[in-house]
Structures are given as structure tokens and as C-alpha cells.
């Protein structure tokens, strides 16, 4: 990952949270669901490109919890509520893996090949392990735009 792409990631996050603030009326809230990467892993992660960034979500960049909160506050929003449920999401990914493979005949009839199957099996199982281990998390966060009073 280059310095310019890292700067682009910061800019995109700033634009995103600024737009949320712009769209909210004073005192109103927005709830987001965001996947985060551990703070301890953030510096290494942001400087590299992993399998998911290359093949599943090209150009994607997960925030860490502290980066997420920093951007929220920079945009002038406040965090009203937050819950994390990565371990539960791991079970969801394992279920998607089962359904995907149980429906493989239907999927392959649409023209998808074994390479596609292996790629998605790797994605689903590696993500399940990542959430189970706590290296990534899923956060639902409720943000509020300040009241004008």
C-alpha cells in the first residue's frame, strides 16, 4: 500500500462521516454496522494489501476501533451507543459457508467455477476464524449530530 493510497483511505473516511453529519438533522441519530480490525494490528494492516482487499473488496480498508472513534469525533458527531459481536458473526459466516456449499450445484449451473468456490470457501472460513479469534470485530455504533441548542 502506498502513501497516496493511505491518504486516500483517510480522505474517504472523512468524506463519509462528514456526509453522515450533513444528512442528519440536529439531535438526530444514525446507526452503522462496521467491521473493525484490532488497534494492535492497525499499523501493519494499513500498510499492506491482504487477500480480502485484493480479491473480495478491492480497495477496502477496515478502521480500527480507535480510528473509527477518532473520525466520528473529528466529524463533530458523538457516539451514543456501541455493541460488538464478532464472535457471533463468526457463526454467521460458518452458516453462510454451509449454505454456499449445499447450494453449489445451483451456483455452478450459473457458470461459477471451482476457483470461485475455493476463493469464497477460503474467504468465509478465514473470516470466521478472524472474528472468532478477535482479530476483527463487528460493531454497531449509533452516532448523533449535536443539537443546535
Question: Language-model features: where?
Answer:
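Glycine-centered flexibility sites
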Residues: 9, 27-28, 59-60
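Single conserved hydrophobic/aromatic residue that forms the stacking wall/gate
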Residues: 1-7, 11
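Substrate-binding/catalytic lobe of Class I Rossmann-like enzymes that use SAM or dcSAM, i.e.
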Residues: 36-149
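A short glycine-rich, Lys/Arg-flanked "PGG" loop and its adjoining helix->strand segment in the class I
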Residues: 14-27
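Conserved strand-to-helix beginnings and helix N-cap segments that scaffold or border functional pockets
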Residues: 13-14, 93
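Conserved beta-strand signature within the Rossmann-like core of class I S-adenosyl-L-methionine
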Residues: 27-35
